[in-house]
Amino acid sequence: MKQVNQYLALFLLLLFAIDCKQKQKEETVDQKVKSPDSLINQQPEPTANTYASVDISPMDMSYFPVDYPKIKMAHANTPPPVARLIYSRPHLQRRPLFNGILKYDEPWRLGANEASEINFYKNVTIQGKKIRAGRYIIYGIPHVDKWTIILNSNIDTWGLKQDTTKDAGRFEIPVSTNGTSLEYFTMVFEKTDTGANLVIAWADVVAKLPIEF
């Protein structure tokens, strides 16, 4: 009888050991499987975009009136905007603006990639010159103390290939500097008493093209 009890005790001990080993194995597996929260927070694996890669210089759009699409959605019978500008926004990336990205006295597309484009929905006046409603590419020639801004009808083009026979107007505007350096090239409209300025800014350089309407 004593021997039977010993065999029974040994059998129970063996069952206990097997059970402990199984639980330990399950805990190890659980540790390898992430919880739902962890899966939610996990970043997706980067994969190649087979349709179109994200450009390093994002395309942007500016309206006058500012935020025109929001105004149109909020108010019925909103009249058309005065102007819309489409351009790409290169950034400094620790480079100096001049002699690093731009050069004085050399034409620049005022952006990146496609030629920057401005659409006037009504006739406007710039420095006394009448500009008819329509689409134009807009580019500039930066100088030390002023910029030359050009409107040209050679639309839907890439980069900047000058065709001066299609110029709609050339305008010289002063430049200034401020204490704030902008990483991204920026063009926006600001309201004035006679219409709006097209503000052109990058790094600490600011130029303004006055538009009357």
Residue locations for each model-derived region?
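Coil residues (strongly favoring Ser/Thr
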Residues: D37-S38, M61, T164, T194
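Short, exposed beta-strand-loop hairpins at the edges of beta-sheets
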Residues: A196-A203
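Mid-length scaffold segments of soluble, non-membrane domains
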Residues: K103-K161
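Sec-dependent bacterial lipoprotein signal peptides
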Residues: M1-I18
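Surface-exposed, gly/pro-biased binding rims or lids
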Residues: D156-G195
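Bacterial signal peptide processing site
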Residues: C20-Q24
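Early exported N-terminus immediately downstream of N-terminal targeting peptides
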Residues: I56-G100
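Post-signal peptide N-terminal segment of mature Sec-exported envelope proteins
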Residues: V29-V54
